[in-house]
Amino acid sequence: MAKLIIINSEKGEKVETHEDIFKLSNLQQREIYAITNERTKSILLNQTFYTILDIENEPKDKVAFDSYNSLFPTSIFSYSRQDRLFGTCNHVLDNNIHYSFALFDSMVDNLSTYLPNDWNIIKISDSIDYPIGNDLLFYVFDNLVHMTIDQFVNSEEKQMNTVPKCKESQDKIKEVFTDIMSHLYMPAIDYDPQSYNYRVSRREIGNLVRDQVFSLVKGHIHLIGPEMESLRNIIMFLHAGNSITFHTIDTSTKSSYIKELEFNKKTKLTMASVLVNQRKNMNNFFKGLIRHYITYGIPRKVYYIGAYPSYWLELITWVPFNIVAYDPKYRRVDNDKIIWYDRLFDRNDIETIESKSYIYIDIRTDVRNLDTTKKQRIFKEEDDMIVDMAIKLASKQCTVMFKRKIFPGNNMSFGDPLFHPKLTQLGREYYNCITTIVSPSVYKESELYSLLLSARSNNVSNYVYGGSKFDQFSIVNCNSTVVALYSLSNTVNSLKTIEHAIKYNHIITFPHRTDRGDWRNIEELDNSSPFQNRKRQLEFEDWSIDPKNYVMKFRCEMVSESVFLQLGHSRALIPDLYNHMISLRMEMPLFYSDRFFSHIGIRQPSIFKRDSYMTSRLSAYISRQLTHSINLSVLKRNHFEGYSGHLIAIETSFSSLVFTMSPYRWLIRAKKLLTKNKMRDKFKIGDGQPHTREEFENTYDYLKINRLVNSTFRSLLLD
């Protein structure tokens, strides 16, 4: 269970030793005030997965605590020691809708017409309150706009990179606004995967987990089902000299021009459709860049020719390189990685480009007021110029991703013609990507249109990343790691495919079989299947897992997402049962130490159950002793030893303990200590001494006689 620890010398639990931290971890409450010293503060920060607010010594923590008090209780996402994001927003108390999504910047004036008159849209990029406008503005627009996709494609608003103004009455606007605000601020009283509370928690902890995973793995990975949320992590991973085999699924289906045109005319416009064009250029840019990493490694330099307006450039402030942009139309970009030259890039500039650079070309001549004949002539001249540039650049061992046009008759494509999915406009564009000089292939106009129409049904991940579907026959290098975050668990994948991935070094996520009740009170199953019920979450259906049966079968580590984050500096304080499980099979640092995934909170399930029914601890000791003798005086003489309460917790509450520790790691450490009981650990938490083999055997006798578990890890621990 994730906890919020508030360090405050005026009140709280005294935490002066590592044993005090162990005791604190077994307290039942989520929010705890603590009085620490420097050593115990360091242990809490580094050796637990708790969110720590030092309100006396850290000004940012004091600000965060004040905000937390005004929002209490709320989820907290810590991206570093002091950079935090809360799960809700109080800017609404001033009638302000707060957003951070840069693609809204050019639309704010028109988007404001979709809100009640007394409400404002404000952009705050680094607020600790959650930017609910990123979601709310999608909803109000989608529910109030009356334009079709086809009407928008031919509108002035599209050319201006904005949205049409709202034409609904204030009464209707208020009705829709009330609906979405009621949804966003609906108090969560039960597990509800359709709630905003759940959506925010899953989105943000997913981002933290992706960051942690990609900082953990090195070398070559097989990446299964990556979504666009992983784009930043993928680029940073490749830029660090690593490599990836992508596994995605092509969902393209054949279609016809009439069918797609009819779809545009009948389908109501949505915000997602509005943003397609900006996202198209961004996705094309990164598709070509990934191709460069695969072919040449880290690019010497990165160029963007024909950059105006490219509002998406504000979304990628994280890129680990500068982007040299050329376009005579200048726009000030709020991204210090962009170096903009407000002039044309011409053939003479090619000589200045270093080899093994990456160039994205998206030159567009303004032809809006020209007749058809002139347009066609300009399109042909522009296409010839772009192709000439691309070939000359490719001859220098550069990767070039460049825009092309479809012309009547035969067309010369350099490599495969590339078509972005989900495009709203049935235009005449496609892209080529080359890394060296290649001979062109001939395509008829009709063939290119057929590919364009089919691509509309493909998914963006497959387009950007490429790769093939992962299945039970996929070949995985023994030195590679399989990474499957929120993907492989989908029920479109067979259990044979999933088990094939689990065999290798891996990091794979699954939902837990339990989503209601209290994490400390999860009953053991009477079957041995690792995979349980299919679970619907948001728009997906996943295989859920039972952690104990899973670990017994596959012999790999399993922890919740919150516990997993302890490997780095990020933390997540969310409802416990919102956590997904993370399956791990890989070499880990300090595996036999309390540095990571230690047994904090191991007593919580037993304390929770005992306290719920006012059961004395003495009852537990007597119950164990009666397994072997009715002489209860032995308990005092042995100081209540002779059995392992921790092992009882592991065996009876394994599927609960994954929310606070790694029970599998505890077993492996305990086995190690049976043969080497004087292992020194400077990270030790708790004063307990290693158990003997006899104590473990006594414990298993107790579990068996009292029929407390259906299956055990006895062979793993004692054989």
Curated annotation (Swiss-Prot):
Domain of life according to the entry: Viruses
Swiss-Prot/TrEMBL keywords: GTP-binding, Methyltransferase, mRNA capping, mRNA processing, Multifunctional enzyme, Nucleotide-binding, Nucleotidyltransferase, RNA-binding, S-adenosyl-L-methionine, Transferase, Virion
Enzyme class: transferase
Entries under Pfam families matching the protein: Rotavirus_VP3 (PF06929)
EC number: 2.7.7.50, 2.1.1.56
Protein family: Belongs to the rotavirus VP3 family.
TM stretches of this protein: none
Function of the protein: Multifunctional enzyme involved in mRNA capping. Catalyzes the formation of the 5' cap structure on the viral plus-strand transcripts. Specifically binds to GTP and displays guanylyltransferase and methyltransferase activities. Together with VP1 polymerase, forms an enzyme complex positioned near the channels situated at each of the five-fold vertices of the core. Following infection, the outermost layer of the virus is lost, leaving a double-layered particle (DLP) made up of the core and VP6 shell.
Family annotation (InterPro entries): VP3_Rotav
Nucleotidyltransferase listed as a keyword: yes
A single MF term (Gene Ontology): mRNA 5'-cap (guanine-N7-)-methyltransferase activity
Species in which this protein is naturally found: Rotavirus X (strain RVX/Human/China/NADRV-J19/1997/GXP[X]) (RV ADRV-N)
A biological process term (GO) from this entry: viral process
Reactions accelerated catalytically: a 5'-end diphospho-ribonucleoside in mRNA + GTP + H(+) = a 5'-end (5'-triphosphoguanosine)-ribonucleoside in mRNA + diphosphate; a 5'-end (5'-triphosphoguanosine)-ribonucleoside in mRNA + S-adenosyl-L-methionine = a 5'-end (N(7)-methyl 5'-triphosphoguanosine)-ribonucleoside in mRNA + S-adenosyl-L-homocysteine
Subcellular location, record wording: Virion
Assembly behavior: Interacts with VP1. Interacts with VP2.
Name of the molecule in the record: Protein VP3
Cellular component, GO, one term: viral nucleocapsid
